[in-house]
Amino acid sequence: MLASYYDRDSTPLSQKELNPILSSHERFVACQGGQRAQLARHRLDGLNLANRMLAEADFSGASLVGATFYGSNLERTNLFCADLRYCDLQAVRLTRADMRGASFKGANLSYAVLDGADLRAARMMVMGAQGVTELRRDHGGERDVPSGLSDSVDFSNCSMKNVSFGNAKLDNANFSGAILEGVKFKGAQLTNVQFRGAVLTGIDLGELKVPPEALEGCVLDVTEEALARVGQLQARLAAHEAWIVSAGGGAPAMLDGEDLRPLQGFTAGRRLAGLSACSTIAVGQDFTECRLQAAKFEKADLRAANFSGCDLRGVSFRGANLAHARFTGARMGAIRLADGRMLHAAVSGANATADQFADASLECTLEGLGLE
């Protein structure tokens, strides 16, 4: 788990201590007694707040790194300058919530509703024994925070499939590297918003009304040229499988630089050991149950790809973007080559977190994989 921005200034609570507070808040909302949850500047990292009625609760300045809010109602909730990095916020309702200055870096907000939410830049000032101090985000020591966005709402590297931002205030919001598939921005106020390197698919770009430089490096919808290559790519993968299972038939596939998204539904369960797919675009690609021993995915865009159940011994993900990729049950470690050498799986330089490999079948340590 990543360290919180606010470790030295917040009050920690355990799950056992938190549960009665949440239950009391639910009674309060239902007008059955209880008390509003006042959790400002509390440390709730990694705790379970899923499927709760949390409307109008106060989490301002709270540290909630890695917590789960799956399916909860957070309408009109106060999340002012809260730290929600790597949270599970899928299917939550954040209608008219105060989210100014909050950080959602790396979080999963897929299918969340943020209509009318206030997402403007802000910073929190705290009165203490030594006077007024500023509660600052240090961005985990990162150096690539875009200029002018240090106090902005941070959605960088988030998974935000089918999120609704209807009429939301998004001044200076940072969506760099986020997966914005099917997101609705109708009526939203988008001033000085940053989308650098984001996935913008299934979106009406006209709704964004942003200058071209704000879309630098973005992954957009599949082009007609890429769709026209589907048959050729399928044939090359079929030939690669034949090369694997036969004694001389087929040929190894070299897919470096290709857009593999048109192959969705074709790649799962295949024998693709030794595949070369460096610098490919494979956002959301389904590789489940594939045999990918010694495959090369160096510098590939594999955001939200599914490698569950794969044999990934000896695979190279060096420099790849693995944000929100899944590895449940994937086998990772070294493999012995025909000449007797051992080839180790590697993720050095990749955009990935340790939590993504929590359910993988690791035959080495994360340090052995080169995870930074």
Please tell me what each predicted stretch does:
Residues 2-26, 30-372:
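Tandem repeat scaffolds
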